A protein has these predicted regions:
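An acidic, glycine-rich, mixed-charge low-complexity segment common to nucleic-acid enzymes
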Residues: 1-66
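A short, basic-hydrophobic beta/loop patch
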Residues: 2-16, 82-134
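Short alpha-helix boundary/capping and kink motifs at helix termini
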Residues: 40-99, 111
């Protein structure tokens, strides 16, 4: 059986870190999301199965013809590597799901490319930082 090529780059693109910051700014205070972006920038890149990421985040597989999923599939077919997905670890005992800060479309494209393809990701813990003093 022919092995499919590695589709993941080791480091996230700067625009993906920026997009993660924009998303996180909608769900938490600036002093919280900025520390998470810094942590994501320096976190190691690890691999997780797409199906597990979708389950842990309680998100659904987007359709293959979704414009962003389709664009990522084109990139894969052209041999261009995808940026790792950026994640905030959930907390099951507290009912907090995994947060996909950036990369849901890449997870879905990876699944369509090869459902057994591990997804490159950077994952950090949410630790409530001290609020800066005014």
């Amino acid at each position: 059986m022919k092995r499919k090529p590695d589709i993941w780059s080791k480091n996230p693109d700067s625009e993906d870190l920026k997009a993660a910051g924009h998303y996180l700014s909608l769900i938490m205070a600036e002093h919280q999301f900025s520390s998470l972006i810094t942590a994501l920038r320096h976190a190691p890149t690890i691999m997780h199965d797409a199906k597990d990421l979708l389950r842990a985040s309680q998100t659904h597989l987007l359709p293959k013809d979704n414009p962003h999923v389709a664009e990522n599939l084109k990139r894969i077919k052209k041999g261009k590597k995808l940026s790792p997905v950026l994640l905030i670890r959930g907390n099951a005992p507290k009912g907090i799901t995994l947060t996909i800060a950036d990369g849901h479309h890449r997870i879905c494209a990876s699944w369509y490319w090869n459902e057994d393809e591990p997804v490159a990701c950077r994952i950090v813990e949410f630790v409530k930082p001290h609020k800066p003093k005014a």
